[in-house]
């Protein structure tokens, strides 16, 4: 719709608003006592036929035939037809009904019947205006197809695209089901700080803010991990948090700077237990919310039936490339092998960083059905417990579905001396320009020095899980109000 045309339509509606007020009608009404939703009437027609009902909603379509008019109104449950006739409403009220616009929100009283065409309808005896719409909705045959506009004006998107509403209803059910599952397993939901004096718990660039009263720099949290593990030190044995993380990074179909994570920690467990609970949790959610473990994502069938494949990173790389990096521990030789494979690596990278880059380039995109990739290098896992039998590797896994990371977990490092040494190595990386390397967190080291029980920890990206289970191509399609660059 052209800007000038839109302005003209808004002008006409403002004039109607003025007319209503001159008539003594308040176009922004108060409470309206509904007896039913649209869906309740449609589902219970036999019990409600000829009964009086009161419903409210937004006018989505309207057509008139002289002294009678039909309209469709929409509430959160769906749409239902209403029928207005001059004989029942009276001349003045019917004229007012005729002047209603698509987008107006009204409350109606009437009896339930079925038209000659068989459509369940409410025959109006009265109505009232609850909110006058001053802007026209997108024309129904076009809908709201401008993707960027859909994100900027999500409120309009939700009005005109019922499938978008359904996605966010499913999101709510998914999160609720996760909470119920963990609560039944004996986990305690907790809340940890959103503003941290030290950014930690993940390799990411933080958002920085300033606390005026304390005159100190603070970081929006990139992960709650180090606070949740402090709770293990304090004696809590099974904790979880579902909340927002913030990372000052690029935006893509898989990344939004503000996103929702589930993190859980279980004392006296390890990464095998975390694999088990991840499988059980995601399959439980899929069965409860979707009713199936065989889903289709972006046209690709995915089988969620257990057990899921588990494969060491080095073995996955060897199967994909033919190169056994377990026998190429020298970083210079590993660098040369990676270059031969066409993997973008940089001189000076360590062995663990190189094989991780090879994995991400050559293996990750091929992992369509759920796959746990286990035993990550210690260089890229500064918070994971080192393997006794192979100290270059850790007891860590990531879960991949459709070539995307869905979860990250490990047997937690609880040795304060080892943890401090790894933090120091991360500081060296920061000094060389790696803004995502961990900062030193002395208080966390102090906590570990009091003794933290061995534990398994798990993080699942809620947004990516919702994308998978609702078949949405972009993370923005599962976040109600994704971050957008302001318009000029």
Swiss-Prot record:
Substrates-to-products reaction catalysed: tRNA(Lys) + L-lysine + ATP = L-lysyl-tRNA(Lys) + AMP + diphosphate
Q: Which Pfam families match?
A: tRNA-synt_2, tRNA_anti-codon
**Is Glycoprotein included in the keywords of this UniProt record?**
no
| GO cellular component entries | cytosol
Q: Name one GO molecular function term.
A: tRNA binding
Keyword ATP-binding appears in the UniProt entry: yes
Quote the cofactor binding remark.
Binds 3 Mg(2+) ions per subunit.
Task: Tell me where it mainly resides.
Answer: cytoplasm
Record keywords: Aminoacyl-tRNA synthetase, ATP-binding, Cytoplasm, Ligase, Magnesium, Metal-binding, Nucleotide-binding, Protein biosynthesis
The listed locations are: Cytoplasm
Q: Which cofactor does it need?
A: Mg(2+)
EC class (word) = ligase
E.C. numbers? 6.1.1.6
Q: Where does Mg(2+) 2 bind?
A: 405
User: Record-annotated residues binding Mg(2+) 1?
Assistant: 398, 405
Q: Name the family the entry cites.
A: Belongs to the class-II aminoacyl-tRNA synthetase family.
For this entry, the protein name equals Lysine--tRNA ligase
Q: Which organism is it from?
A: Carboxydothermus hydrogenoformans (strain ATCC BAA-161 / DSM 6008 / Z-2901)
């Amino acid at each position: 719709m052209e800007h000038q045309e839109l302005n003209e339509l808004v002008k006409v509606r403002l004039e109607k608003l003025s007319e209503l007020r001159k008539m003594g009608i308040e176009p922004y009404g108060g409470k309206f006592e509904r007896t039913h939703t649209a869906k309740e009437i449609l589902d219970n027609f036999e019990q409600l036929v000829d009964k009086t009902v009161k419903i409210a909603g937004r006018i989505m379509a309207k057509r008139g035939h002289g002294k009678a008019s039909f309209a469709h109104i929409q509430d959160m449950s769906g749409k239902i037809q209403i029928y207005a006739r001059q004989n029942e409403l009276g001349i003045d009220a019917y004229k007012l009904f005729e002047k209603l616009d698509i987008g107006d929100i009204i409350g109606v009283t009437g009896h339930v019947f079925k038209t000659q065409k068989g459509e369940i309808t409410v025959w109006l005896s009265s109505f009232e205006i609850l909110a006058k719409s001053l802007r026209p909705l997108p024309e129904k045959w076009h809908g709201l197809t401008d993707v960027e506009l859909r994100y900027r004006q999500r409120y309009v998107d939700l009005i005109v695209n019922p499938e978008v509403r359904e996605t966010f209803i499913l999101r709510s059910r998914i999160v609720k089901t996760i909470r119920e599952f963990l609560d039944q397993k004996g986990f305690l939901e907790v809340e940890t700080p959103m503003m941290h004096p030290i950014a930690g718990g993940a390799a990411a660039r933080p958002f920085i803010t300033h606390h005026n009263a304390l005159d100190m720099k603070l970081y929006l949290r990139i992960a709650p991990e180090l606070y949740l593990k402090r709770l293990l030190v304090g004696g809590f044995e099974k904790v979880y948090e579902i909340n927002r993380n913030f990372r000052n990074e690029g935006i893509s179909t898989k990344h939004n700077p503000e996103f929702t994570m589930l993190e859980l920690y279980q004392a006296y467990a390890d990464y095998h237990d975390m694999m088990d609970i991840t499988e059980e949790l995601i399959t439980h959610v899929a069965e409860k919310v979707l009713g199936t473990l065989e889903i289709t994502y972006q046209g690709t069938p995915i089988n969620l039936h257990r057990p899921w494949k588990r494969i060491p990173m080095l073995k996955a790389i060897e199967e994909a490339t033919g190169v056994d990096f377990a026998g190429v521990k020298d970083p210079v030789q590993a660098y040369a092998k990676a270059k031969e494979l066409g993997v973008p690596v940089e001189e000076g990278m360590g062995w663990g960083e190189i094989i991780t880059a090879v994995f991400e380039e050559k293996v990750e995109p091929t992992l369509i059905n759920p796959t746990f990739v286990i035993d990550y290098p210690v260089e890229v896992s500064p918070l994971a417990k080192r393997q006794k039998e192979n100290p270059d590797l850790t007891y860590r896994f990531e879960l991949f579905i459709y070539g995307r990371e869905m979860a990250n977990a490990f047997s937690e490092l609880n040795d304060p001396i080892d943890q401090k040494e790894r933090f120091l190595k991360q500081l060296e990386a920061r000094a060389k320009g790696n803004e995502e390397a961990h900062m030193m967190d002395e208080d966390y080291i102090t906590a570990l020095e009091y003794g933290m029980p061995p534990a398994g920890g798990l993080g699942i990206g809620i947004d990516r899980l919702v994308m998978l289970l609702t078949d949405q191509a972009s993370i923005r399609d599962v976040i109600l109000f994704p971050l957008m660059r302001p318009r000029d």
